[in-house]
Amino acid sequence: MAINNGSRQVGLNWNRVSGVNGYEIYQVANGKRKLVKRITNSSTKECTIGGLTNGKSSSFCMRSYRLLSDKRKVYSGYTSTKSATPKALSDKASDIHSIYYNAKTRRKVTVYNYTKKKNQILQSGTKVIAPSKTIKGYITCMLTNGQKIKIKGSDLRTYGYKWDSKTDYSKSAKEEMINSKNLVSETKYLIWASQYRCRINVFKGSVGNWKLIKAFKCGIGTYDAPSPKGIRKIYSKTLHGKYGVTLQWSNGGENGTGNTFHEPLGVAVGYPNSHGCFRMKMNDLMWMYNNIPIGTLVYSW
């Protein structure tokens, strides 16, 4: 078992054990073990433990188990204990986020303004920047003047994307953010598709030690046909397909037919203009085709 740190969390990685049904993760303190996570998928090789305190060391161990015919569990021995200290991200890395959504208030509402530290009344139709399209409960949003507010999601109606591809995050901020995510790729490469910046970021290395080597501007899915978010991988590569050079990175997803990295098809890159795929310039796409192996992890966010 190996361990690496992030902000208020640690990531654990291990080699898959054949013939088992799952794993149990224990936090170790004062000589005692406390079960913190049970993993029932035997093919899983990593997990993240959150809710920790930055700057405070935490220790963990694990064991595998096998289910008998009568559902009883037979356990392996415990692994050796590993420790890591979560650390807060820098301001620049903390500022990295996914695509925002333009929204308006549905009615006249009272919200809490974090900047002013008091309640505030917003008129119906007030423009707000929201972090999500599907909103439940209370969320933190921004007014167009940059002030942060707390508002009930049901009081908002989203109507479009807010993105910014004119500028980009720094290399160091990208590496710090990605290395806090405990992302494990089957290859020595990792791809992060930044939907807010309309960028395909290519890293080389291994979990906890990813180094940015390329950043390509891209087109992303539109508000009505969004690019899937989450962790995927490169499933296939085609040189002369329906859309020319393609790398398939999603089976199914929001649009049901899978998504690829492919040619721009006569349109510019750097803004939402696809049906969920990532459109790239031909030279950038060919670099991906020639260098990125099948199985490479794709983090779309």
For the regions a language model picked out, list residue spans one by one.
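Exported/periplasmic cell-wall-interacting domains
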Residues: 92-100, 104, 162, 167-168, ...
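Short beta-strand segments within Ig-like beta-sandwich modules, predominantly Fibronectin type-III
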Residues: 37-43
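Extracellular low-complexity, O-glycosylation-prone stalks/linkers
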Residues: 17-37
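Hydrophobic loop/turn residues within beta-sheet-rich immunoglobulin-like superfamily modules
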Residues: 17, 52-54, 133, 154
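Beta-loop motif signature
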Residues: 22, 33, 87-145, 155-181
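Pro/Thr/Ser/Gly-rich low-complexity, intrinsically disordered linker/stalk tracts
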Residues: 1-19, 54, 71-89
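Hydrophobic core positions of the immunoglobulin-like beta-sandwich fold
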Residues: 14, 47-50
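Beta-strand-rich modules
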Residues: 49-70
